[in-house]
Every structure is written in structure tokens, then in C-alpha cells.
Amino acid sequence: MNWKTTLTAAGLASAMIAAPALAETVKWDMANEYQATSIHGQAQAVFAETARDASGGSIDITSHFGGSIGYKSKEHFDAVADGALPIANTSMGQVAGIEPMFLLSSLPFLVGSASEAQTLWDVAKPYYEEVFARNNQILLYASPWPPAGIWAKKAIVSGDSLAGVKVRAWDASGTSTLQTAGAAAIQMSWADVVPQLASGGIDGVLTSAEGGTNAKFWEHLTHFSAINYSMSLNMTHVNKDAYDALSDDQRAALSTAAQAASDEAWGALATRVAENFAEMEANGITVIKDVPSEFLGLLSTSGASVYSDWLKKVGADGEAILAAYRAQR
């Protein structure tokens, strides 16, 4: 071996020692029961793209919107915990039967603005993280729904107009509140809503203007009452074993992606309601923005027991969250 060969071999050896090992490419399928055009879908697209770019292509996330992967939101929590799904974007009120803490953002009339919804999320985030941790999961970010109202085939502006209306709610909180107020409310997954509207199984829906716009509710309904019931959260969570298998750089990339998605989702609230209302009215929906205070009072009173029932289930943590939130809002 001559001196050139010796130096070349030595240089190659040094380069191999100095070069970091390339991270193995991770391919994840990400479930989401809602449409790609929703706030949650658009934030998820940002999340997947940023994760890919920040990881140098070593994190490859394929989004499955509209429940197309075969899981509804109510099934996501257990599926991610068990590893059947590596990651999901989930409407958390629908899994409150498993972990009651997740009902928090759906409590009736607790928040009245985007800033209050953000404050509640900031206060409660450590508690959410703890719940995910004890269920073999990592919480990555939350995306908010705009305020929920009642979509129906008529103006819902009083107890009389609500009485007997078959209204879908997404969780136990909404179901209880509407039933107490006189509606024939039932809890139903999002994927089942449009088929039930089409068949006459329901004739009203408690959801945001955003949700109904994305699902083109004007094909079945005529009115939206902006009662501002709640601003519930979707959360993106990943199986802890899958997360732990990532390299340090990949986990950092995932954190960067989660922040980008969070910024996208919360930032969209500033203009989304006005955009939704304009599209709804262009498609023939009567938007009732000034809902009578008497009706709002009825709904608020009807939802009072939801708070006491929730606090019985979550105990001191719930009291601490509500106290901190009310002190900061």
C-alpha cells in the first residue's frame, strides 16, 4: 500500500466516524374523521409537510381524512394507545367516556372567544399531557373548533322551537344540555351525520359553522343559530412506543411540526367564522347571529348539571383548572 492509498483509507475511515448515522425513514398513517378543508385538516397538512421538511424527509406522514382509514374519533384514543394507529387527530369530546378530562373544552358556555379558548388550553395542557402519558401516548398539539351553534331546518331561537327536534351532539355534554332544554338529542360520530341527515334520522346538528360548511349542510338544512355553545378541541396524539423509536433529531422535527400546525389552526380562527357565514349565506343558509338572550339563558341553565357531573369525575384537577382559567381570562 503506497502513501496515497494509506491517506485515502485513513480519510475515509475518519469521515465514516465523523458522519452522523442517517435516521431511518418513518412512515405513519394519520387518522382524521374530518375533511381536509377543515381547520383541523389544513393544520394537519401543515404538520405533515413540516415534519417531512424538518426531518430531511425521514418522517413521512400520510393523512387519511373523512374517516377513510376506518376509525372514527371515538375509536382513536384506544387505537393509538395500542399501536393500531401510530398517530391521530381526534375530536376529544368523543373519547370523554374513556377519560373525562377530555370533556373540558366542550363544557357549555365556558369560553366566549378565541382568546378565552386559548387561555383554557394553556391552563389545561399539562393535565391533558398527563392523561395521554398514562395511556401510552404523547400529546403533540391541539386545534380548536370555531364556536358551535345549531344547524336545523328552521330557526332554533326558543325552547318551543327546540322542543322535540332530533339534534346530533358530538359528546355527552351537548347531548345532556340539549335534552334538558327539550330537544331529542343523540350523540353521534361525525362520519354518521350526513347519512343520518339524508335519511331523516336527525333534523338538526350541534356543531360549528365550520363543520357544517365543510360538509355542505345546506344540502339538507336551512338555518344556523349562532348560540356559541363551546369551542371544543381536536388533539393530535402519537403512540409513545412509536415516538420513542424516533431519533432525537426526528423528535425535534416533530415538535417543530406540531408548533407550526398549532399556529396554523389557532391563527385561522381570526377570520374563519366570517368566511363560513359568508359561504353559508351564499348557499341559502339563514344565519341567526343575534340569538335571543332568553333562549341562551335556557341553554345555560340546562347545561348547569354538566359542570357538577364533570367535577365529580375529575375531582380536584377540574377545580384547579377552572379556577386558574377564570383568574386568567
Label for each model-derived stretch:
Residues 10-11, 21:
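Cleavable N-terminal signal peptides
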Residues 1-2:
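N-terminal secretory signal peptides that target proteins for export/translocation
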Residues 12-16:
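Hydrophobic alpha-helical targeting segments used for export or membrane insertion
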Residues 17-23:
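Sec/Tat signal peptide C-region and signal peptidase I cleavage site
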Residues 5-8, 24-116, 124-125, 131-329:
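N-terminal secretory/targeting leader peptides
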